[in-house]
């Protein structure tokens, strides 16, 4: 793929910037703008919700202008936003900059996934998904360590400089991504001129089923950051350091073996639906183990070892599911309306992230094991749904490398063979 190294390097650099502020977001913006924590929290919540409403427009923009152009525009907006944050000392100024930045942040995953669809085909999509995820984890971890060191040396006043450093990271990432060259399928230009919109997405029942299945799995993705710390503190009565240890293990495994695990899955020839289902089942196994641990409540040493083992299983589920699930959604979307399709798919993650705090805390108040039970059922249901959807999805979505019979008889969307064709 032409420009692949530039894309990977750009994503890694931008991830360092993200890692410099995400773990300290409220504190970061409080010190950069001088506004109170309460005001910062309200502004970030409101602008984040508005950003969700903007996501369908981002999908339409991708379909009209192409993912690369929109990707570069979002990098420019994010760079400008962080460069302006130190000057946004008043509430209206901070709200304006936060809103513009939130629109770009919320839209970025859609555009990034669409860009992967533009620059890679077949098994290369799975490989690129895994490489990008590993770099994002490594970059965010490096960014968090970097800002921790900067704050230790120069104090909270250094937040202003990290904001500018973040702006610089986004600008450099944009310059690197500008070197990427999308690959077009024959007839794409004509397809883009054909009338299409969100009605087409809403009529695609298999893709909506895929989105619903991903919502169930996405609740599990939110568990590590939202449920895990509360569960340790309120049900297991463990030290806060366990949360830090869990995050460290998860980040290290994602960055260190993510590409290896995804490569092993890809070389096995497994269908993407089945790989994603396996990832969901590994999630379910980890959640059931949490129920067992919460029932037994052993001593602190045993709890520590058990929790770390559970995090390893959970992370393996993430590493198996993420590349396959991402490539599955990208490949199931018709190229002419891929932006709209992926905007719809991304809502599954956004809704899960928005619902997770209230859902988990409400269930946890009843019984510490209850949220894990709900998550285990959800993950198992997602796996079953993926297997059921397999025969209704396009063959090029289900298979990283479609069988020869399918490739030879490939047709445009609407007449294309599904995975069931390969069973004959």
Residues covered by each model-derived region:
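Structural signature of the two symmetry-related core transmembrane helices
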Residues: 69-84, 274-290
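Conserved MFS/SLC helix-loop-helix module at the cytosolic interface between two early adjacent transmembrane helices
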Residues: 52-89
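C-terminal membrane-cytosol helix-exit motif in multi-pass small-molecule transporters
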Residues: 148, 168-187, 385-389
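Cytoplasmic helix-loop-helix junction between adjacent transmembrane helices
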Residues: 97-138
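Transmembrane alpha-helix termini and helix-breaking/packing motifs in multi-pass membrane transporters
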Residues: 142-161, 234, 354-374
């Amino acid at each position: 793929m032409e420009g692949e190294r530039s894309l990977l390097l750009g994503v890694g650099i931008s991830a360092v910037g993200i890692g410099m502020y995400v773990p300290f977001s409220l504190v970061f913006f409080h010190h950069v703008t001088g506004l109170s924590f309460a005001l910062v929290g309200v502004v970030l919540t409101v602008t984040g919700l508005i950003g969700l409403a903007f996501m369908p427009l981002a999908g339409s923009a991708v379909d009209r202008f192409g993912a690369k152009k929109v990707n570069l525009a979002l990098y420019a907006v994010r760079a400008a936003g962080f460069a302006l944050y130190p000057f946004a000392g008043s509430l209206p100024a901070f709200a304006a900059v936060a809103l513009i930045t939130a629109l770009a942040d919320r839209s970025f995953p859609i555009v990034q996934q669409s860009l992967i669809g533009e620059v890679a085909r077949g098994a290369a999509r799975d490989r690129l998904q895994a490489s990008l995820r590993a770099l994002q984890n490594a970059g965010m971890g490096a960014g968090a360590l970097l800002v921790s060191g900067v704050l230790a040396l120069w104090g909270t006043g250094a937040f202003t400089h990290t904001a500018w450093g973040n702006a610089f990271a986004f600008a450099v990432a944009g310059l690197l991504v500008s070197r990427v060259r999308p690959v077009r399928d024959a007839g794409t230009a004509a397809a883009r001129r054909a009338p299409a919109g969100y009605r087409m997405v809403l009529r695609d029942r298999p893709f909506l089923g895929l989105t619903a299945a991903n919502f169930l799995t996405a609740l599990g993705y939110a568990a590590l950051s939202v449920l895990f710390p509360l569960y340790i503190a309120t049900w297991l009565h463990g030290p806060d350091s366990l949360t830090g240890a869990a995050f460290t293990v998860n980040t290290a495994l994602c960055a260190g073996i993510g590409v290896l695990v995804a490569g092993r899955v890809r070389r096995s020839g497994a269908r993407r639906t089945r790989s994603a289902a396996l990832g969901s089942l590994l999630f379910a196994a980890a959640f059931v183990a949490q129920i067992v641990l919460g029932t037994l409540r052993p001593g602190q040493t045993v709890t520590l070892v058990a929790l770390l083992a559970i995090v390893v299983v959970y992370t393996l589920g993430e590493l198996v599911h993420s590349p396959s699930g991402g490539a599955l959604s990208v490949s199931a979307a018709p190229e002419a309306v891929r932006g709209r399709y992926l905007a719809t798919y991304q809502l599954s993650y956004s809704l899960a992230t928005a619902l997770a705090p209230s859902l988990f805390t409400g269930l946890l108040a009843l019984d510490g094991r209850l949220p894990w039970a709900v998550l285990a059922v959800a993950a198992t249901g997602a796996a079953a749904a993926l297997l059921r959807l397999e025969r209704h999805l396009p063959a090029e979505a289900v298979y990283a490398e479609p069988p020869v019979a399918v490739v030879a008889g490939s047709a445009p969307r609407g007449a294309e063979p599904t995975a069931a064709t390969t069973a004959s």
